[in-house]
Amino acid sequence: MTTPFKRVHLIVMDSVGIGEAPDAAAFNDEGSHTLKHTLEGFNQTLPNLEKLGLGNIEELPVVNKVEQPGAFYTKLSEASVGKDTMTGHWEIMGLNIMQPFKVYPNGFPDELIQEIEEMTGRKVVANKPASGTAIIDELGEHQMKTGDLIVYTSADPVLQIAAHEDIIPLEELYDICEKVRELTKDPKYLIGRVIARPYVGEPGNFTRTSNRHDYALKPFGKTVMNTLKDNNYDVIAIGKINDIYDGEGVTEAIRTKNNMDGMDQLINVVKKDFNGISFLNLVDFDALYGHRRDKEGYAQAIKDFDERLPELIDNLQEDDLVIITADHGNDPIADGTDHTREYIPVLMFSPKIDKYHELSGDSTFSSIGATIADNFNVELPEFGKSYLNEMGVEH
């Protein structure tokens, strides 16, 4: 059976939200608007995102509304009860997460720390949100002397364990993380990811190694990616995507170093012949700029992404569809360091389409997954609606 688009390239600009969601107040996020606040005062233009119609979704600084947008455009609000990366991505692929992952801005509960200490026979130090490099600078020497576990978190629902490779061998650190992963599946903790963070070096000159290992949770149901894989389509995960879904529904995983490397890897994939989807997460917006409330850096990162779009577009095949979206907000002028509950922008375009218009909004990110499933004639997810008819695409 032929499909309207042979390939779909899905790009998630991690945290690039487009205004407070209808239920933002319930998340203490009233007034949040990542794109607007990031671009206020920015003295450069975003010509390629403007041409696609980003400024048609919502009035934005720097990005004007255009008469003839180069993409279908809309915005979606989140149905799931959460505003983290895993929840947003899982919803994009058709799930509705009713029990949110937990974040720990004041560190983990004493009860959990005690359980970790009893289970491992090692004392826990730190137990606070911290930058991974800063925490080993602060406690790395102590850890080497004592063999304690450096346990810390971030603004995401993660528990990270740092240890010097000469003091706690990798196998032991991995074993500890596996056991902590089991502990934290308990609904009272519900931590999205446990991460082994080994490091080497001497006091004053520690470096984290590439032996990091993530212990994620599998999605709580069958995603559109699973359905595509089951139907022998390619699902190429680029960047954080493989980790976010714990490998579920992935046929090939490609690691990335940063946003620009992510775009390089995507363009390499686009040049190859395959049948299915590529799925890229660009994490720098969130990790380097949103959480750090670095408005200028965030705006420049959007500019850098904008500059890569012509190269992507030049390499597309006639029957490719590109979808650009986000997974939550992370307003750089909001209080604290957490994500913000926002609408996500959606831009969809293909070389085979020359006329575009606004699409109706929806109250779930799953409409992205539903559109992809519909395109490939596979089972649609329980949530979301396909946009193919609104796009005027015969299928």
UniProtKB/Swiss-Prot annotation:
E.C. code: 5.4.2.7
UniProt remark on cofactor binding: Binds 2 manganese ions.
Binding site for Mn(2+) 1: 14, 327-328
Catalytic activity, reaction form: 2-deoxy-alpha-D-ribose 1-phosphate = 2-deoxy-D-ribose 5-phosphate; alpha-D-ribose 1-phosphate = D-ribose 5-phosphate
Subcellular location: Cytoplasm
Residues of the signal peptide: none
GO molecular function: magnesium ion binding; manganese ion binding; phosphopentomutase activity
Family matches, as Gene3D superfamilies: Alkaline Phosphatase, subunit A, Phosphopentomutase
InterPro entries, per the entry: Alkaline_phosphatase_core_sf, DeoB, Metalloenzyme, Phosphopentomutase_DeoB_cap_sf
Residues that, per the record, bind Mn(2+) 2: 286, 291, 339
GO cellular component: cytosol
Keyword Disulfide bond: no
Family, per entry: Belongs to the phosphopentomutase family.
PANTHER family assigned to the protein according to its UniProt record, in alphabetical order: PHOSPHOPENTOMUTASE
Protein name: Phosphopentomutase
Source organism per UniProt: Staphylococcus haemolyticus (strain JCSC1435)
